[in-house]
Amino acid sequence: MNLNQVTLPALDVAASVAFYRGMGFVQIVDSVHYARFQCPAGDATFSVHAVDSAPLQSGVVIYFECEKLDQQVDALEAAGYEFSTRPRDERWLWREARLTDPSGNVLCLYHAGANRKHPPWRMPAP
């Protein structure tokens, strides 16, 4: 199996489209109630779909990997994006920064290098 995409709820699809396009994601599907994006690097996609009310915070965080995290955050801040957490080194060996989209979905921009899939505590292959 391979993960195809993640779909996020959007209170205002047009606002979400502007938000994600402004971050550099490429919109590949457009409709009144739904939009789908491809990540600028790699093959991953995600989408937003219209909802009438914001779901309760579920604890879900969407992670987007950035090769040059600090520069990416600086560029987004210069463009008006507000981060709840500036880039910082975490104990799990990732560098992370967090923000929310217009519907309150939590996003984490991060850089992990080899630790993304191969942290020191990785389980041995079966």
Where would I find each of the regions flagged by the language model?
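N-terminal beta-strand motif that seeds the catalytic metal site of vicinal oxygen chelate
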Residues: M1-A14, V60-I62, A112-P126
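Vicinal oxygen chelate
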Residues: N2-L11, V51-P126
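Short beta-strand-to-loop elements that line the ligand-binding cleft
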Residues: L8, I28-V29, R86-D89
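Short strand-connecting beta-turns/loops that link adjacent beta-strands
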Residues: V13, D30, A41-G42, W92, ...
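Alpha-helical macromolecular-interaction surfaces
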Residues: A15-A18, Q71
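Conserved acetyl-CoA-binding loop of GNAT-fold acetyltransferases
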Residues: R21-I28, Y81-E82
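Conserved short beta-strand elements that form part of the metal-binding/catalytic scaffold
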Residues: V26-V60, V106-G113
